């Protein structure tokens, strides 16, 4: 909607929409770097990445911080944390539809050598065959430590969006 509005108001603009989870993956990289090195990154924007793929199925084929290649640090971390994943201090995958432990992301990195840059629940949607090992049944999803968007959440979200639209139109 935002990009569509930009083109409507300013047709000459060169813009594209990108899932915000790319930025979330930069924050995960920051956390892993800090945990592994003990050095603090003041701003996750200082992590430079090259993004490839399509919306909700995006990948980093390059990631660096101050000229330091983050792939070896990420590789080491994914090997050491393939079972428990990465947990951001204030978030827990078990309490939220939209959180995850990034274990699918780690698994895909070990398989393909690129950093998956979307949430685990989006990544598995694009992985028929391979994805079956992630989505086989509720116990499998739980083992991979990511949440699925529930029908109840979708219904509630729709009602909230419709109410907001009505308020804005009034």
Predicted regions and their residues:
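Class I S-adenosyl-L-methionine
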Residues: 4-7, 30, 34
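Catalytic or ion-translocation cores adjacent to nucleophile or general acid/base/metal-coordination motifs
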Residues: 11-32
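Long, compositionally biased stretches enriched for glycine and/or charged residues
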Residues: 34-170
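Rossmann-fold NAD(P)-binding glycine/threonine-rich loop
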Residues: 1-13
């Amino acid at each position: 909607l935002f990009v569509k509005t930009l083109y409507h108001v300013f047709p000459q603009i060169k813009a594209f929409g990108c899932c915000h989870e790319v930025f979330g993956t930069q924050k995960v990289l920051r956390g892993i770097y800090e945990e592994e090195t003990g050095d603090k990154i003041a701003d996750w924007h200082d992590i430079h990445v090259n993004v490839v793929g399509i919306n909700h199925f995006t990948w980093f084929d390059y990631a660096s911080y101050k000229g330091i290649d983050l792939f070896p640090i990420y590789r080491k971390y994914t090997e050491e944390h393939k079972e428990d994943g990465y947990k951001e201090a204030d978030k827990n995958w078990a309490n939220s539809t939209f959180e995850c432990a990034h274990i699918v992301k780690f698994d895909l990195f070990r398989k393909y050598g690129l950093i998956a840059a979307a949430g685990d629940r989006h990544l598995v949607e694009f992985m028929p065959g391979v994805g079956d090992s992630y989505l086989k049944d509720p116990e499998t999803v739980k083992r991979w430590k990511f949440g699925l968007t529930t029908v109840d959440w979708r219904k509630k979200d729709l009602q909230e969006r419709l109410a907001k639209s009505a308020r804005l139109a009034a």
